[in-house]
Amino acid sequence: MAEQESLEFGKADFVLMDTVSMPEFMANLRLRFEKGRIYTFIGEVVVSVNPYKVLNIYGRDTIEQYKGRELYERPPHLFAIADAAYKAMKRRSKDTCIMISGESGAGKTEASKYIMQYIAAITNPSQRAEIERVKNMLLKSNCVLEAFGNAKTNRNDNSSRFGKYMDINFDFKGDPIGGHINNYLLEKSRVIVQQPGERSFHSFYQLLQGGSEQMLHSLHLQKSLSSYNYIRVGAQLKSSINDAAEFKVVADAMKVIGFKPEEIQTVYKILAAILHLGNLKFIVDGDTPLIENGKVVSVIAELLSTKADMVEKALLYRTVATGRDIIDKQHTEQEASYGRDAFAKAIYERLFCWIVTRINDIIEVKNYDTTVHGKNTVIGVLDIYGFEIFDNNSFEQFCINYCNEKLQQLFIQLVLKQEQEEYQREGIPWKHIDYFNNQIIVDLVEQQHKGIIAILDDACMNVGKVTDGMFLEALNSKLGKHGHFSSRKTCASDKILEFDRDFRIRHYAGDVVYSVIGFIDKNKDTLFQDFKRLMYNSSNPVLKNMWPEGKLSITEVTKRPLTAATLFKNSMIALVDNLASKEPYYVRCIKPNDKKSPQIFDDERCRHQVEYLGLLENVRVRRAGFAFRQTYEKFLHRYKMISEFTWPNHDLPSDKEAVKKLIERCGFQDDVAYGKTKIFIRTPRTLFTLEELRAQMLVRVVLFLQKVWRGTLARMRYKRTKAALTIIRYYRRYKVKSYIHEVARRFHGVKNMRDYGKHVKWPTPPKVLRRFEEALQSIFNRWRASQLIKTIPASDLPQVRAKVAAMEMLKGQRADLGLQRAWEGNYLASKPDTPQTSGTFVPVANELKRKDKYMNVLFSCHVRKVNRFSKVEDRAIFVTDRHLYKMDPTKQYKVMKTIPLYNLTGLSVSNGKDQLVVFHTKDNKDLIVCLFSKQPTHESRIGELVGVLVNHFKSEKRHLQVNVTNPVQCSLHGKKCTVSVETRLNQPQPDFTKNRSGFILSVPGN
């Protein structure tokens, strides 16, 4: 929901003023400043007044209020313009730039930092580590560049003494992926001299105030600022910047960015070397130049990783090549001092440029492929020195003010001139608004052959000794009649200007008097080749790489380098061309007073800035103009989905007609104008409503696309799955066939083998056939068994079946099953086993057959049995297919007990070689016996007994439980007891004895 400020704070947008006049503009600006509202809109331009105090309007909560909101929805703020530039870049894939302008001390540097902070905060919602790393480095680069490129001036405690333009690269999702920094015209003369009330660059003070005692000792420094000539002027000045704290912040930032420890140490050594250079004093002994404090030379040589004698020679002599001859020309005291200062300035400039290059190497976009990652878009942020008028204005102020003229010209071209020309070109009704075009001042400075820079270059190239006065004379002769140039010679009555020293330029921001003293020297930017060779020969690789031209031979003839002014002019032209290629957003900074006071609003001072920034003309153009314009084709491409007449494609005669239909459908026809090739929208609210409608339709479009795409994916997945299943099915069929064929091949002819294929190894089956293999092996084993059984006589088959049953039940659990001998079964009828009583047993057996009608005798044998009264007796058991009989052989095999087989629930035997067996019955009257044979003795018959009984029960489809355990559990008339087996050496025959838990069967040992 849109939030508007109360009228007590004035008009939030100058476009909403009742009348467009300077008094009303200034009254609104003053009211908002006094109410703590430092930002005001002019349409899509933000006017910012430096509050000279800390305001709590840049926190995370404020960022969230502006994130993704339109300009008119929230009160004026830097975040609003930053978000507008970001949205334009992301929505339309168009490069944008934010140009921050205003004079020195108006708050440009702080504004750029807040804009960077906002962009960093609203990007990378998914918290990708690489994006966070890039954002962190982009933010940290600010404080590093401020330390080495900013200084305290009379107008600003943190004045940028260089120009900075940063491109931030974004991927297709709108997340920062890298950047690039361009720097312009570092004010290196500040290294050696400062005006009263000013300081050198922050880096020197931070090192001395924040460096540890150990570090300063290693650099041969002391904390006293007044000990060093180059910074003595500002040593006692108070600054709002805490140098000691900032030193740690900058050091940490350099580590975060990626500077190596040895690189950071080299930076400190260079700063220390410059401070020591400033303390060098030269004297002349006759014709020989000398250094008064020679120990300092050794310190400088140590810091620069070179030799002291080489440093001394470079400071006192100049090597000159004349043809093939090379001579060392002695310096005068003045020339030596000049060379020392030029060397100090050059070292610092190279250091600063190296820092910028090093940051660029680290933050540049790497491995970005537009075909894979989408278009790489850019937001540029320009923070460059503001317009300056000092008591003494020299070459640096001339370049700085020329830069501001170029930027003002760009503003005029884009906002005032081109916009009005576009309305006329497109046939939009328009009343021309007058404005001051400063192109005449730009031409005065940069015009080929006729401009001040061209005249300065000509003077520098003249043979012989050329003075600054000669340069001024050339200006007078060539520009004397120019309306924006004057000097004492062209305007003799103007006593402000001194003869042979001053000239005045009528800039768009006001008149500035420049002193020509130093123009020639600063433009030539002379540094003797000896110093370049000295630094190139340093053993420190970082220093060596800063001076690549030092490798040139002394006799090598080089092309005359471009002058400082021409280099700066070329860089400004390139900068303006770069900015002109992007969609611009403006922050116009105003300085409320020269006393840095948060309470004072200097009307005259502010009025002057409003006038030269062209803000009133900007208001007039904005009130009469349109907030947005776009070609019909692009407009239709973005918004066609919000009307059924244009979605998905229109059938109207032209895109213009289609756009008209779309606008009428939405009811915005009163807020637009139709040009020849573009549509013009007057208010941002209409554009915002179009965006809302588009966003609503995009949901439906996305759902439709998702439905179609998901359907396509599902069909593709189904086809792939079906194809995969077909492949799997055929592959499995192939594997099955291969397996079957291999089995058939291996087992071919096994019927004719002696072992019927027992030795044949089965092939490894596929997983799907493992159960089939088990079944197949079972079938094969059954077949093989049937083949083996065919060789057995029919009379032996019952015995074989019984042995198989015994094996199934007892194999692996008992040592001897008696499988190797023939099983007779009815041992009581066998004469070898019972020679005296066999004749008596047979009639008894026949009588029982007649009586009980049994069909087969399963087993009979002599046993020793124990009863519940612990009485041990010799008995015999006779097992038929119907009953189990317990007999007394001493009484002619009288039947002592008959147990029907259906009453038998199981057998229990031990796991040893003994013949213990317990017959379990349903009535819990178990029969405990130990089998024994008389001929041969100790013959094992347990396996035979178990086998015939289990086989018989199986034939009747009943199950007989067989337990193999020691001790054996049993029940005598319902009483639980155990029978354990012990082996005794002197035991003649098996015998039972009583113990606490039941019985012990003692069997003879070996």
UniProtKB/Swiss-Prot annotation:
Q: Where in the cell is it found?
A: Cytoplasm; Perikaryon; Cell projection, Dendrite; Early endosome
- A GO CC annotation given for this chain: neuron projection
When this gene is knocked out, what is seen? Mutants display no defects in body left-right asymmetry, no obvious motor defects, and normal kidney and liver morphology. Tracheal epithelial cells display aberrant ciliary bending angles and disordered ciliary bending patterns. Likewise, planar cell polarity is disrupted in ependymal epithelial cells.
Q: Which molecular-function annotations from GO does this UniProt entry contain?
A: actin filament binding; ATP binding; calcium-dependent protein binding; calmodulin binding; microfilament motor activity; protein domain specific binding
Top-rank taxon of the source lineage equals Eukaryota
- Pinpoint the TH1 domain residues: 812-1005
- Give me the segments passing through the membrane: none
Modification N-acetylalanine occurs at: A2
Tissue specificity, per the record, is: Detected on tracheal epithelial cells, and on epithelial cells and brush border cells in duodenum, jejunum and ileum. Detected on myelinated white matter in the cerebellum, and the myelinated part of the optic nerve. Detected on mature oligodendrocites. Detected on the outside of the myelin sheet that surrounds axons (at protein level). Ubiquitous. Highest levels in adult brain, and spinal cord. Moderate levels in lung, kidney, liver and spleen. Low levels in testis and heart (at protein level).
Start and end of every IQ domain?
699-719, 721-741
Task: Give all Phosphotyrosine modified positions.
Answer: Y536
Q: Which UniProt keywords apply?
A: Acetylation, Actin-binding, ATP-binding, Calmodulin-binding, Cell projection, Cytoplasm, Endosome, Motor protein, Myosin, Nucleotide-binding, Phosphoprotein, Protein transport, Repeat, Transport
Taking every annotated instance into account, which residue ranges of this chain make up the domain Myosin motor? 9-695
Q: Which Pfam families match?
A: IQ (PF00612), Myosin_head (PF00063), Myosin_TH1 (PF06017)
An example GO biological process term is: forebrain development
Q: Which residues bind ATP?
A: G102, E103, S104, G105, A106, G107, K108, T109
Give positions of region: Interaction with calmodulin.
776-896
Q: Which residues carry this modification: Phosphoserine?
A: S200
Query: Its quaternary structure?
Result: Interacts (via the two IQ motifs) with calmodulin. Binds an additional calmodulin chain via a third, C-terminal region. Interacts with F-actin.
Per the entry, what this protein does is: Unconventional myosin that functions as actin-based motor protein with ATPase activity. Plays a role in endosomal protein trafficking, and especially in the transfer of cargo proteins from early to recycling endosomes. Required for normal planar cell polarity in ciliated tracheal cells, for normal rotational polarity of cilia, and for coordinated, unidirectional ciliary movement in the trachea. Required for normal, polarized cilia organization in brain ependymal epithelial cells.
The record comments on the domains as follows: Binds a calmodulin chain via each of the two IQ domains. IQ domain 1 mediates interaction with calmodulin both in the presence and in the absence of Ca(2+). IQ domain 2 mediates interaction with calmodulin in the presence of Ca(2+). The TH1 domain is required for activity in complementing zebrafish defects in Kupffer's vesicle lumen size.
Q: Which family does it belong to?
A: Belongs to the TRAFAC class myosin-kinesin ATPase superfamily. Myosin family.
This chain's protein is named Unconventional myosin-Id
Species name: Rattus norvegicus
